[in-house]
Amino acid sequence: MGSRRAAGRGWGLGGRAGAGGDSEDDGPVWTPGPASRSYLLSVRPEASLSSNRLSHPSSGRSTFCSIIAQLTEETQPLFETTLKSRAVSEDSDVRFTCIVTGYPEPEVTWYKDDIELDRYCGLPKYEITHQGNRHTLQLYRCQEEDAAIYQASARNTKGIVSCSGVLEVGTMTEYKIHQRWFAKLKRKAAAKMREIEQSWKHGKEASGEADTLLRKISPDRFQRKRRLSGVEEAVLSTPVREMEEGSSAAWQEGETESAQHPGLGLINSFAPGEAPTNGEPAPENGEDEERGLLTYICEVMELGPQNSPPKESGAKKKRKDEESKPGEQKLELEKAEGSQCSSENVVPSTDKPNSSRREKSTDTQPAQTQPRGRVARGPGIESTRKTASVLGIQDKVQDVPAPAPAPVPAPALAPAPVPVPAPTPVPSRSSEQVYFSLKDMFMETTRAGRSQEEEKPPPPSTRVAGESPPGKTPVKSRLEKVPMVSSQPTSSMVPPPIKPLNRKRFAPPKSKVESTTTSLSSQTSESMAQSLGKALPSASTQVPTPPARRRHGTRDSPLQGQTSHKTPGEALESPATVAPTKSANSSSDTVSVDHDSSGNQGATEPMDTETQEDGRTLVDGRTGSRKKTHTDGKLQVDGRTQGDGAQDRAHASPRTQAGEKAPTDVVTQGSERPQSDRSSWKNLVTQRRVDMQVGQMQAGERWQQDPGDARIQEEEKETQSAAGSIPVAFETQSEQLSMASLSSLPGALKGSPSGCPRESQAIECFEKSTEAPCVQERSDLMLRSEEAAFRSHEDGLLGPPSGNRTYPTQLPPEGHSEHLGGQTHQRSEQEDSLSQCPKKEQPQEPLHVGLSGGHSTGLSQEVPAMPSLPGTGLTSSLQEELPGTAASLHTNTDVPLPSRDQDFPSSAPTLQLGPGSPTQSHPPEAMATSSEGACAKEPNVDGRSSGTRSCDPGLIDSLKNYLLLLLKLSSPETSEARAESQEVADTGGLTSSSTLVPTMEVAGLSPRTSRRILERVENNHLVQSAQTLLLSPCTSRRLTGLLDREVQAGQQALAAAQCSRGPCPTPLTIPAIVVGEEGSAGEDSEERTSQESDKKGLLGEVEGHTVESRTQEPCQEEAMPGEALTGLPAATPEELALGARRKRFLPKVRAGSDGEANKAEERESPTVSPRGPRKGLTPGSPGTPGRERRSPTQARKASMLEVPGAEEEPATGDLVSRSKDSGLDSEPAVDEGKQEALAKQRKAKDLLKAPQVIRKIRVEQFPDSSGSLKLWCQFFNIVSDSVLTWAKDQHPVGEVNRSAGDEGPAALAIVQASPTDCGVYRCTIQNEHGSASTDFCLSPEVLSGFISREEGEVGEEIEMTPMVFAKGLADSGCWGDKLFGRLVSEELRGGGHGLQKASRAKVIYGLEPIFESGRTCIIKVSSLLVFGPSSETSLLGRNYDVTIQGCKIQNMSREYCKIFAAEARAASGFGEVPEIIPLYLIYRPANNIPYATLEEDLGKPLQTYCSRQWGCAGAPAAASSSEALQKCQTFQHWLYQWTNGSFLVTDLTGADWKMTDVQIATKLRGYQGLKESCFPALLDQFASSHQCNTYCDMLGLKPLKGPEAAHPQAKAKGSKSPSAGRKGSQLSPQPQKKGLPSPQGSRKSAPSSRATLQASQAATVQLLGQPPVQDGSSKAQSMR
């Protein structure tokens, strides 16, 4: 710190300027609320410098206070018991009591209406006492004037709560009391309005005074400050001084950014030049104003309120943003001019610091979420101390990254920050700072000590400072700073990650170099983030980060462009740093990823990451592994946590240094790049995004695997593609970098037995090397979308998308490999040689290859070799899944993702490709970790890893042994397998495919080897060997299960293959050797794919993964059509025996279909279902059909839930008919073979377009106290209009249309969740291209985890609106006058079929004359509401529509019933007539689901009189002999006839003669405005099943012998029914039948009857109103 500090002596400079450039992003880490911005974050006494953390300016008393505050957990007041309303007669005594808890002890104030009661002088009327936490108000001899609303208000430093009770005395009822109260409120409101109007006039004057006050304090500073909202929020104003303009602009920019995204917590948001100095420009020339500034700050703070002011207004933020943009430009120029600024440049950075400080305040909130100390201290201090030159450069970088971080929420970090959604304003600047400083101090000390101990080098910040004087090591410090910044942004960004949407889509482009690195780490982190995100989303508030991100993306794009401009070197360095950091922390990774997206931030992040990691570790108890890594990691050289690993740093330093040389130049260049560059880069990115989007459609399905997988793969791909596309120059540079990193790596590699550090380093190097060239690509990729990324990843697997695409047979140039590997040329070379000579099987090398395979083409090639390698065995499969499908990681998405982060370090090799040797030894471990989580403890459901990430060498050895065992088993075939794998590689990228989609291989061995093992080894043998490994119980179990399932799957495949050997196209088990055609190769790959997908399914891969992998493989094959035929070895006797050749040549089976379709189609869907293994084709393979259409995981997990045949894809024959039904096959005449072919073709075409599940169903609780839950999930790749359907226990509960491209979350609200709502919920999306679904079991255990409904003591205010049919039935109803009143809800009652919630409520007042006070009534609300993100499908809108429909249905039926009653009374002897009670619409403003219906309480248990078959009413059925039941059936008959079969009441329940819970069916959609009640089948069913009774005869109703009877009956009954005047329909049914469009297409009645019905329908429509639309909600409206 000292050396850094030397750069700028001023406190501002010392703390901020030196590091400012680099750490500006970091610096902002602290970012308290606007109020606290007035503090200079970095200011602290000289002594505090040693802490290496930003300490509070006034660290003395405030620090002590903050420590004490932290020691005691403060809680806001809480009423354990609330006031109970009382009603007494006059002269009675009354006591109100309540029990309040909270710390500090709350102070309770009593109010009568709005008048405070004196706690001491109340006698003789009242007395206020309290004993402990029980507070009492005693009233004596109450009179009517004492009747009022009494309120107890409890407050402490944490908040204020209140409760109230009503005292009724004598005739002064509650109603009157409330009326009196409302009158008072109205008077108050009127007076308030007058005051406001007057205050507007004085407002300007007041603000002027405030300004004057501040100006008096410090005219200079004041002018530089901007005030956010009044004096309280002293914020820097636009700098006045010209010389400060550049720097101030920079800081403003940074500030603006941070302010703009305060919620994002862009700790790194500072503009490149800004050094976060609490908003004060750092004194120029290093003025030594520490003392003065501190004093000034204190004064300002004293003047201003202690509470943190509200966040800056949007307008101000916008203003700041705008200002910051120019600032950025200036900063860029400054950077270009003086990227190597000397300490003199510190001044600008100092100004920047101001902005940083502001950003800091903004960021601080997120940062606070993380351990403040860490975040603040690392970035702030380091950034402050970074050299000016570093500052200049880094400022630029930071500028870019800062914005990016926000857009790229760090999912991993997000968990920690979760509590602090970016939006939440910091409690108070001062307090925040204090806390921050406190934490910083503690964390700094701990960390500093730790880092020092571990690192010998100074603590992260210290080291940064010490590493080089500002001028000396600008790059290194910058890098380090960048990492710090990144981590900070990560934390700040964390909140955004909450949103689990495609991060990449929203992620801003990364800087070129960084983007590459970022993409790698971001892949990992992103997948992590996703896994975390899944949990996080609920944990962390879902911040609408995506939009913000988007904003950033646009805006950040330039910044990021800057970042990319940053300089390949810098970017590379930062990425490198970031990469380790990422590896180090899953959260860091996540963050890094996000940052990576931002690119620069990712780079900045590493340093902070350490800090963050510590913070995370502290804050994030969640990731135990992270903690361990953090604690151990530093020692471990985990490499994952840059901050953690001094080693990492040491390596990073060399790496950085090595990279710095070129990078520095690059950086300078980057800084020199004009903004225009950025725009062009932006355009580039945009173009790329477009391209990617196009590709996304294709890649979408692959994407489908797992968003995380896709991401990882995508990023890997990107990395690969980037590497592939990297220009030679970049390559050279990257090589240099990699060399540098190699030099630094060696120690690290050696240092870390687990190889994790090595891997992470390798990743870094790899990222670096790839990054420089790939940065743009990366950013673009990032921008594109996860899907695009995924696709690119696949491409990468196939070959670098860039066009360096290397066929599996040919490795990329060594340099390229090096790039990819980034770790060492040697390793790359080894890899190259390995890949080149896959036949040579060196278990380790193959492993290495396998690991790297996923990442680079060369690697993927190697991977193919891997499959054959026994050593690769388990690891291989894991690897295959990891690289290929990223499945292993994603497969166990929940586990793998975290494990992935963990793996990243440990499985980094996998990603790294480059680090062959180190990886080789550790690959199995890494692999195991990734797929099995062997190395890492099982991640929590959140996806966070709960265990240590570090891999156990023992585990690795055990895995190796196991793999060797497998090798021995398959040794005879090893060479063959190798050859095969090589061939496979040759075959159209099958190698990569195999990685992506292994055939039925055991642990990734070649199919042949796997087959042999399966044949020779018994299930328990494998399982036992797995069990004998020295693994943790968890891992062991998981591994064993994996092997077990794998073996089972393999055996199944084997059996299927054997069965299909002859007639079927290739069985899955046969090695993926393409003997004849691409098609066959495609088939094989497909088989492989399906098998892999099965395997994945077994592993718990995400639904749709199978499809994805399959899709990927076909794509790959298509991509490299010629490769399939390359160098196939001669068929071995075994192969021939297995029928491999035969298989390959069997494409004729598909040949029946059009030749063209066969290719793609066969590849994608060999025969039947893309998913189902070939075994599905074999006649004797039962059960495959069910699996074929859904993801393997789902098939296995939810097979029990699945409606048999509902989604099954029957077999070949069925397929055709199925496709016919769905309209896919429009040529019924085609012979069966052709039909199959056509079906296959279409399916093959659609595979890429079929929707995919991106997020499975998860449950959340609504924020209000209503007890309602939300189930939500998300689909992507929705390329055409789709229908989204929710079902509970296989009963559809609602559906909603989704337009193409609408990939927002799909949600189902469960209103007032209760045990009756438990069941299996499924969400299915379907369109012409396919369908995807996801299930969730809502069990009582899950339900018990949520807070049950809370009912306020005094109920809730409501608005009630009656429905009026002023014009009779011709009118669809209108609404009467509203009544305002209050209800108290009581117990919940059951709903019919769980589709409706009914609760009894007591009317307090306001609903007369309909409901008298004290009367009970029933509130009903649809219990299941399907909604979505769009305004048309919003929860409120759906709730309103469904409720309105319910009102209309019942009230319209009531009108019909009135007519029926009139006719019935005319019939002598008919007797009493059923009556349908009215429904009233109520609006409850305090409820998230505000609309409901209100009806009278019938006071008796309900009986069912009519019910449609599908949903039996909740009430017991009335006796069939019941008069009421018979009359209800007569009413149905009469109504059916009276409306000519257009309208029918299908459900009635009631007590005695009063009916409710009405459901209807209409023949026409939209009949009478009833949108969702079109069920023509129910009308037909009624007509055929109704049996007339005596009451039907009394009314002269004709028997219904079928639908056709309706018309004649109507005719006969002309006098009584509207059909009387309609002659046309009866006259000539035939012509009508032809001429009229049949509204009831679904009806299956005879033509004549249909014609008549149509005619009568038309007439009815004319008579009764406009046609409606149908909505599943009517169903949801069942009886209570």
UniProtKB/Swiss-Prot annotation:
| A single MF term (Gene Ontology) | protein serine kinase activity
Q: Where is the composition biased (Pro residues)?
A: 402-426
The protein's name in its UniProt record: Alpha-protein kinase 3
Keywords in UniProt for this one?
Developmental protein, Disulfide bond, Immunoglobulin domain, Kinase, Nucleus, Phosphoprotein, Repeat, Serine/threonine-protein kinase, Transferase
- Which residues belong to any copy of the Alpha-type protein kinase domain? 1367-1600
Entry GO CC:
nucleus
The record's similarity note reads: Belongs to the protein kinase superfamily. Alpha-type protein kinase family. ALPK subfamily.
Bias-annotated ranges (Polar residues): 339-353, 557-566, 731-744, 917-932, 1639-1660, 1671-1680
Family matches, as Gene3D superfamilies: Immunoglobulins, MHCK/EF2 kinase
Q: List the disulfide bonds.
A: C1273-C1323
Q: How is loss of this gene reflected in the phenotype of the organism?
A: Mice are viable and were born at the expected Mendelian ratio. They however develop spontaneous cardiomyopathy with features of both hypertrophic and dilated forms of cardiomyopathy. Cardiac hypertrophy is characterized by increased thickness of both left and right ventricular walls and by significantly increased heart weight. Some features are also associated with dilated cardiomyopathy. Cardiomyocytes show an altered architecture, characterized by reduced numbers of abnormal intercalated disks.
Reactions performed catalytically? L-seryl-[protein] + ATP = O-phospho-L-seryl-[protein] + ADP + H(+); L-threonyl-[protein] + ATP = O-phospho-L-threonyl-[protein] + ADP + H(+)
Species this protein is from: Mus musculus (Mouse)
Q: What is its subcellular localisation?
A: Nucleus
Task: Mark the residues carrying the PTM Phosphoserine.
Answer: S229, S1199
> Biased composition, Gly residues: where in the chain?
9-21
What the entry lists under PROSITE patterns is as follows: ALPHA_KINASE, IG_LIKE
